[in-house]
Regions:
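Conserved beta-strand hairpin/beta-sheet module of binuclear metal-dependent hydrolase folds
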Residues: 1-6
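Cap/insert and terminal regions of metallo-dependent hydrolase folds
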Residues: 9-110
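Small/flexible residues
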Residues: 26, 118-119
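A short acidic, often aromatic-flanked loop/helix-cap motif at beta-alpha or helix-coil junctions
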Residues: 112-118
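Short, surface-exposed amphipathic charged segments that create phosphate/polyanion-binding patches used
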Residues: 120-125
């Protein structure tokens, strides 16, 4: 099961999505979201962007609110849309993961051209 956030500001409503979705997805059916595609870029300045674009810390909150098994950071590094540097979001994500004890395989980004093989339930490698 895949969750795609699109452009979004942070809201605790995402925890409600988890509750409603998980109620229909039993453990026997694989339960919850296997992967969430979460935006991690185009967030600065916060006073202007907070309503439309989460920052990295909020993306990690969404990952946890959804109970996603893994999350891929998207919506960064393509073109200069906001005030943060193009390469800032993955660097910030690495720092947030370290601070919160989150593994690199749980919340991650892919480099341009990088691929990962995906099975029906989880990653191959």
């Amino acid at each position: 099961h895949l969750f795609f956030a699109g452009d979004t500001g942070y809201s605790r409503d995402l925890a409600d999505i988890r509750a409603r979705y998980a109620a229909r997805q039993t453990a026997a059916a694989g339960g919850g979201f296997d992967i969430a595609l979460l935006p991690i870029g185009a967030y600065a300045p916060r006073w202007f962007m907070a309503g439309q674009h989460v920052d990295v810390e909020e993306a990690v909150k969404i990952h946890r609110d959804l109970g996603a098994k893994r999350s891929l950071g998207v919506h960064w590094g393509t073109f200069q849309l906001s005030d943060e540097a193009l390469d800032e979001p993955p660097k910030t994500l690495a720092a947030v993961r370290l601070a919160e004890g989150i593994g690199e395989d749980e919340v991650f980004v892919l480099a341009i051209g990088e691929t990962r093989r995906v099975r029906a339930r989880g990653f191959v490698g």
